[in-house]
């Protein structure tokens, strides 16, 4: 039973790394911090339905958020997205 748990943990960690690592590589960094507006679109997990906004590099675009996971390039309103991400 211990081996099965270990293999499950290794599999879970592998999946998390495969999902997270490419997103971090594609992000821009400023002063050592991730610029959340440069993170890729990510609808998250689960099957809930929340209308949210993300910055696509040019403008804010509406999308459906699943309710769990995803990344910080997610805003409750277009105004909040533009305020945080649009360059003046």
UniProtKB/Swiss-Prot annotation:
Its main location: secreted. GO terms for molecular function: potassium channel regulator activity; serine-type endopeptidase inhibitor activity; toxin activity. Residues 1-27 form the signal peptide. GO terms for biological process: envenomation resulting in negative regulation of voltage-gated potassium channel activity in another organism. The keyword Disulfide bond applies. Expressed by the venom gland. Belongs to the venom Kunitz-type family. 03 (sub-Kunitz) subfamily. Serine protease inhibitor that inhibits trypsin at a molar ratio of 1:1. This is Kunitz-type U15-theraphotoxin-Hs1b. It comes from Cyriopagopus schmidti.
């Amino acid at each position: 039973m211990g081996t099965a748990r270990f293999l499950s943990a290794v599999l879970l960690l592998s999946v998390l790394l495969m999902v997270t690592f490419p997103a971090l590589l594609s992000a821009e960094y400023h002063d050592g911090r991730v610029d959340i507006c440069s993170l890729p679109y990510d609808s998250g997990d689960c099957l809930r339905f929340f209308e949210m906004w993300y910055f696509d590099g040019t403008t804010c675009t509406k999308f459906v958020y699943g309710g769990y996971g995803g990344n910080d390039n997610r805003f409750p309103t277009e105004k909040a997205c533009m305020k945080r991400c649009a360059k003046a």
